[in-house]
Structures are given as C-alpha cells and as structure tokens.
Amino acid sequence: MKNIILANDFSENSEIAIKFAVELCKKTKSRLFIIHVFDISALLANPTEIPYFPNVDGELLEAQKTKLKEQFLNIAQDDSNQIEVVFESFEHTSVSMCILEKVEHYKGDLLVMGAHGKRQFLEFLIGSNTKSVITDCLCPVFVVPAEAEFHLPDKIMFASDIGADNIEALHALVSVAELFEAKIFVIHISTDYESFSLNRMNDFKKQMTLEINYPKLNFEFLLSNDINDRLDEYVRENSINLITMVEHEDKSFFERLFKRDHVKNMISLTQIPLLCFNQKYLVKRSFSEAEAKLKLH
C-alpha cells in the first residue's frame, strides 16, 4: 500500500475518517492524498454558505484547499508530521465521477470516505448515485458512517455469500488485518434450512484455509429466519468494529441480502465502518498477482 485517498466533504464524521487514514498511513508508510470535490452550481444555489470569489477556478479552489489543511492539522496534530500529505480541491458537476478519476490518477490503494447522516449512509448502501463509487472504484473503499466512533480495527467481520470472489477478497482483507493483528470472522447466514448443507460449508472453509495463511481467521455458518437481526446480534456479541463485504455490479450487497425496509433497521450499519471490495478491483488484483508470479519464474 503506497497511496491512500481521503475524499473529505467536511461532514460530521470527517474526524474519524482522517484519524483512520492517518493511522493506516503510519503503519504502511503510505502517502495521504486529501481531496475535496464540489459542484459549484450546488454551492451557488445557496450563496450565503460561501464568500464571493470572482475567480472560481483560482480563489475558491485555494480556499477549499486551505480549509482541508486547517481541518487536518487540527485533527491529526502531532501525527501530521509523521506522514506525507497532499491537499487538493476540485470542481466537478459529478462528485462521484471526479473521486473515481482522482483515485485512478493518484494510483490509490485505498479510498476513505464518509457519509453525512444516518439516512444518507443507508441510501449510500442500497442504491443511491453515490454507490457508483463503491461499485466502480479500482481500490477498496473504506466508508465511515455518521454515528461511528474511532477504533483501530481488531475484530473484522467478513460477510460472505460463498461466492468465487470471496477468496480474492479475503486475501486483500488479510493484508489490512495483519497491520492491526486483527481477528477476521468470516460469516455466512442462510435462511433456507432445506438447502443448508454442512458439507458445502465445510468444503468452503477448507478451501479458504488452504488458500489463505492467516492464524486469526475464524469461520461461522449460521441459520436464521432474519438475516439482518442475526447480523446485528453477531456484531454486538463479538464486538466487531469493521464490517467487510464484496460489492457486485448487478446488485448492491445489501440489496441482495435484505429488503430495503429491513436495512434501515440495522443499527450496526450506522455505527460501524465498512470496507468494501468490488469485482473490478478483485479482478485487477488477481491479474496483478498472476503477473508478479510469472516475473518470479
């Protein structure tokens, strides 16, 4: 991990996002790019929120960059001297598109971002336009909900659908978990008692164990009539402080697992950060590893 991108919208949970990004940069010796993207038409719709700038491309961009620096120094304090930080601000009609472009431009290895409030965060998960950041980003996305508290992750839950891409996602997750010596809880919850096959689950566990050499890897296969209630319960019982998922292009992870009304009742989704891997990133990662192995031979 060399470059971490923090998309900062000055929301209420920016402090947590900054703290996490700083700690990760310290552990990986990564460079931190803090970017702010805004749509000038949206700002001008409420001119009382911004001062008058005759030169939008110059003065307003510099003002936003200065605001980024001041906020970062106030939160990071002494840690600000331990990492390399680059501050940039951009004007774009599509905030999500600009973020994706900058992740690619800076060759980002991780994107950290937050959501303003509970409602926006849940919409972020189950079908808003902003979800394109998760599904299209060429690196993992760390999402901080508004009600989250800052904790270095030591207990990570990987919500598995037993898909073929789960192994590659777990490889990526282990590289993060090792930094914090964190436990990984791989869980799969089924509502279908008839199709629930213990043999299939054991085969999945064996395959994962053979593929991934990490001593703090735990597997749980559970039956429940209510997936979201069981997930909430599991998070509380095991003091989970990071939830991981694989995002698919055809349908949101949470759209596939839950009905919309059920998601809005999940307490853990508004309190615990998410680490999201999408299929584009996992394919890219798999090819990169294959190329590296070929070069060794």
Question: Which residue ranges define each predicted feature?
Answer:
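Charged helix-capping and loop-helix junction motifs
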Residues: I126-N129, R200-F204, L257-V263
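A short acidic, glycine-rich active-site loop
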Residues: F53-K67
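Structural beta-alpha unit
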Residues: L73-L111, I212-V263, I272, Q279-A290, ...
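Short beta-strand elements of ligand-binding domains
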Residues: M113-A115, P140-A146, V246, L274-N278
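Small/aliphatic-rich secondary-structure junction motif
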Residues: M1-P54, K155-E220, I240-I243, L269, ...
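Acidic (E/D-rich), amphipathic helical modules within compact regulatory domains
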Residues: D109-L125
